[in-house]
Amino acid sequence: MTNKKYSKALKRVEDTISAGFLMEKIEAERNDRNKSAFVWPENESKETCRVKLEIGSSVRPDPFSKRSMKTYIQAYLEEKGMQDVVTEFDLQEVKVNTLDITRTFLDKVMSVKRHAICGTLPRKVRHIYDVTVLLDRSDIQDFLNDTERLKQLLKLTKETDSFYLQKRNISEDYDPLGAYAFENWKQYFNDEIRGRYETLHEDLLYTSNRQSFEKAIQAFEFISHLFTSIGE
């Protein structure tokens, strides 16, 4: 499809999802392949009830995993034995292709470096947490131990970033194809970032536990050392 056809298709999806809600478009984040807007119920305050709606078609989920999804309402009704209501409203479980967690991990790893060098890391500190937590997962450890698979997917991630970042106004100091080399931009993990990281549990995490910034630094040092060992 052409870019204009993509834009029209995404607009139809956006209109369907936002039907019955008030909407404020985020023009700086809208183009033919991406639509961003804040939406909120007509009888509620925008300041307290708005949700950011993001719809995009820039990147294919590669590699992907097929996952089943159902609404919380359907799950609740089934738990309460109200199958007649589920049937009445034709609530169904759907299967969707989702980005495999290994690619999600690498996307997060690369985005932290990009935001650090481009000066936007203070707004993306949650990414540091995501990388640190994902690194502890057994499936991520298995992935990192598979050198051939890691090199292949890291190459794909870098090349994809390079292609799409050409269309965005980012710092020329960031090279998406370059070596990870955490030691060259570690200075951006400064006191400001530490302070925000150690207070994430107050508003952004599903835990009340204060996070260790030292553990986060160690995670990125480990990742950088591993990437260096495979020439990345």
Whereabouts are the PLM-identified features?
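Structured mid-to-C-terminal alpha-helical surface segments
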Residues: 2-232
